[in-house]
């Protein structure tokens, strides 16, 4: 089984659209890990990326680790 390169997914599909400032702004919408997962899923669906659940999970984990630090 291949490891998922969550950073590549973010670089190719997320920060190219809105940049990383949305993760660090004071008035960000996402205020929990569940909300972050939902936001990643919504973006994935809006962009018609057809990611697998494990890709959504990997991107959520990466964004949480790098920017949000919500408790699991």
Swiss-Prot record:
Organism in which the protein naturally occurs: Halochromatium salexigens (Chromatium salexigens)
One term of GO molecular function: metal ion binding
Residues given in the record as heme binding sites: 14, 17-18
Alphabetically ordered keywords of this record: Heme, Iron, Metal-binding
Protein name: Green heme protein
Domain of life, source organism: Bacteria
């Amino acid at each position: 089984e291949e490891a998922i390169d969550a950073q590549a997914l973010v670089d190719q599909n997320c920060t190219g659209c809105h940049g990383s400032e949305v993760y660090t702004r004071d008035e960000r919408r996402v205020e929990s890990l569940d909300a972050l997962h939902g936001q990643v899923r919504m973006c994935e669906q809006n962009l018609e990326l057809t990611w697998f659940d494990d890709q959504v999970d990997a991107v959520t984990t990466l964004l949480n680790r790098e920017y949000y630090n919500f408790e699991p």
